[in-house]
Amino acid sequence: MQKDALNNVHITDEQVLMTPEQLKAAFPLSLQQEAQIADSRKTISDIIAGRDPRLLVVCGPCSIHDPETALEYARRFKALAAEVSDSLYLVMRVYFEKPRTTVGWKGLINDPHMDGSFDVEAGLQIARKLLLELVNMGLPLATEALDPNSPQYLGDLFSWSAIGARTTESQTHREMASGLSMPVGFKNGTDGSLATAINAMRAAAQPHRFVGINQAGQVALLQTQGNPDGHVILRGGKAPNYSPADVAQCEKEMEQAGLRPSLMVDCSHGNSNKDYRRQPAVAESVVAQIKDGNRSIIGCLLYTSDAADDR
């Protein structure tokens, strides 16, 4: 690493990581698994477009910190998914990266041993191995697209992705979303702004050119065709925004932007005032609105973990 008066002044070290194609060669998908993931992505796309009448439910722990616990959760999740499959399409939330307002543990990929060692290469390997086991169980998987390089390593294993409230306004993440090979939900801003998510959805639907990495780990100019499967996620802000009036306002703003209203409700975060025990009340409101004839709500997000796990 070159370090002098002008270069890398605030960088203390660098480590070259394995490339995406090396990781995939070590932990490959089978043809059957590829077909399964493609099918689940199509199902979610059909739900977003209104071609499938079921409700999309993305559910799981706030973040993954222990693979064995995640597998035990997945076994229960699979049984529930089969039980409700006529009316609900359950997708397991498997988040490895945690956005932080200031500092804190950034997730299993960044610090898999949770000891400040930041063994990212081990984190990528642990994450891909776990995802393959979950896919092998027949589960569709969801994540938050946070680091722009992570999708090259793990994106082929996911069926749905979210762009979080802190990153929805980021041009980098809008460009990345335009190239993701799966449906993407955009959360409203932390202040509750709908325009942030709606503008992100519009931007991601368009073609983009941006600098990223390819499967060989080379820096490359990537060109996208745009992602047609975007939708808004209402996650609350300074106040909850899941009421019928809030949903109607979102529908209105999406229509004014030339978009077909399609939205999910995040039952946590600002909509539950960050109290996990309030999630059922939010979900009940979503169900009531759908029973009353709402057709723009395509799903909801639920968070399940060990009580008030706030990692």
Give the label of every model feature segment.
Residues S296-L302:
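Thiamine diphosphate
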Residues G60, V265:
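Conserved, mostly hydrophobic/aromatic
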Residues E14-I48:
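N- or domain-start disorder-to-order transition segments that initiate the globular core
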Residues I37, R41, I64-H65, A70, ...:
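Metallocofactor- and cofactor-centric catalytic cores in central/energy metabolism, strongly enriched
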Residues Q2-N8, S87-Y242, D246-V247, G270, ...:
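Active-site-facing alpha/beta catalytic cores
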Residues H65-A81, F118-I126:
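Glycine-rich anion/phosphate-binding loops
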Residues A49, A82, L134-N136, E255-G258:
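Acidic (Asp/Glu)-rich catalytic clusters
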Residues Y303-D310:
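Conserved small/polar residues in nucleotide/adenosyl-binding loops
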